[in-house]
Amino acid sequence: MAGETNEDVKAMSFEQALDALEKIVDDLERGDVPLDQSIRIYERGEALKAHCDRLLKAAEDKVEKIRLSRDGKPVGTEPLDAD
């Protein structure tokens, strides 16, 4: 984590951010990280989680449902109602 700031999180893809978050969780669960470093990586984890949440929300907003005709052929799309 040395040299990394939370600003670089914004440039990460969802997969990169999720991988980094999973590593942080593993490190914290092992419990062999010094307290000051635990606090720093926890804060980074919060930034990674927020970034992943934003990217997921953006992806959900783009998902569309395919409309089918009576004979089952695709005729267009409409926004997906996730509720």
UniProtKB/Swiss-Prot annotation:
Domain of life: Bacteria
GO cellular component terms, A-Z: cytosol; exodeoxyribonuclease VII complex
Protein name, UniProt field: Exodeoxyribonuclease 7 small subunit
Cited Pfam families: Exonuc_VII_S (PF02609)
Subunit structure: Heterooligomer composed of large and small subunits.
Role of this protein: Bidirectionally degrades single-stranded DNA into large acid-insoluble oligonucleotides, which are then degraded further into small acid-soluble oligonucleotides.
Subcellular localization(s) per the UniProt record: Cytoplasm
Family label: Belongs to the XseB family.
Gene: xseB
Main location: cytoplasm
Keywords noted in UniProt: Cytoplasm, Exonuclease, Hydrolase, Nuclease
An individual GO BP term: DNA catabolic process
PANTHER family in alphabetical order: EXODEOXYRIBONUCLEASE 7 SMALL SUBUNIT
Reaction catalysis annotation: Exonucleolytic cleavage in either 5'- to 3'- or 3'- to 5'-direction to yield nucleoside 5'-phosphates
